Curated annotation (Swiss-Prot):
GO terms for cellular component: cytoplasm. The keyword Cytoplasm applies. It comes from Shewanella sp. (strain MR-4). The keyword Transit peptide does not apply. This is dTTP/UTP pyrophosphatase. InterPro entries: ITPase-like_fam, Maf-like. Its cofactor is a divalent metal cation. Nucleoside triphosphate pyrophosphatase that hydrolyzes dTTP and UTP. May have a dual role in cell division arrest and in preventing the incorporation of modified nucleotides into cellular nucleic acids. Gene3D superfamilies: 3.90.950.10. Belongs to the Maf family. YhdE subfamily. Keywords: Cytoplasm, Hydrolase, Nucleotide metabolism. HAMAP family: Maf. The lineage of its organism: Bacteria, Pseudomonadati, Pseudomonadota, Gammaproteobacteria, Alteromonadales. One of its GO terms (biological process) is nucleotide metabolic process.
Length: 194
């Protein structure tokens, strides 16, 4: 079985590498699938993130047509505040708007991971509750100026400077970073990949 990560995210690549526990025989390649990430009318956040993870895995599988026995991992992460999906910011003003909305509140981070093979696709969903401290305008301005939030769902990275804003989490840290390790290991183990 040839493992493929359907993502160019450096965070997902690093997390998937951790699953190998340093073993030289744990290898994977990466592809960059292109899918439409527009939510469907009335689609619930849980359904949306699981659909995107599966579509990324299947689109990645289509890119591996010449590969022997590909098993493709797709993943997607969203931040949900009061039932609104907060994706990646479109610009700095949007990042500031999102951070102001998260300030002093709890939100849910949902990450879905899917494994697609020729005959089946399996999906796991992980949810983590994250509570932010109250952010000042100066905090928000400085953080956005760092550019860190610009490629991240919810406009922050818990593993970077944005971790300064996290008061507490309930659930999986790796879910918030972008690839839930326990659930990903389970999917790989069920597929015979160790």
């Amino acid at each position: 079985m040839n493992l493929v990560l359907a993502s160019t995210s450096p965070r997902r690549k690093e997390l998937l590498t951790h699953i190998g526990l340093g073993r030289a025989e744990f290898r994977f390649t990466q592809v960059a699938p292109d899918i439409d990430e527009t939510p469907k009318a009335g689609e619930l956040p849980r359904d949306y993130v699981q659909r995107l993870a599966a579509e990324k895995a299947l689109a990645g599988l289509a890119l591996c047509s010449g590969m022997s026995q590909p098993a493709v991992l797709g993943s997607d992460t969203i931040v949900v505040l009061e039932n609104e999906i907060l994706g990646k910011p479109v610009d700095e003003a949007d990042a500031k708007r999102v951070l102001r909305a998260l300030s002093g509140k709890a939100h849910t981070v949902m990450t879905a991971v899917a494994l697609a093979k020729a005959d089946q696709t399996s999906v796991r969903l992980v949810e983590t509750l994250v509570r932010f401290c109250v952010l000042s305008d100066a905090d928000i301005d400085a953080y956005v100026a760092s550019q860190e939030p610009m490629d991240k769902a919810g406009s922050y990275g818990i593993q970077g400077l944005g971790g300064c804003f996290v008061e507490s989490i309930e659930g999986s840290y790796s879910c918030v970073v972008g690839l839930p390790l326990v659930e990903t290991r389970e999917l790989l183990s069920e597929a015979g990949i160790r």
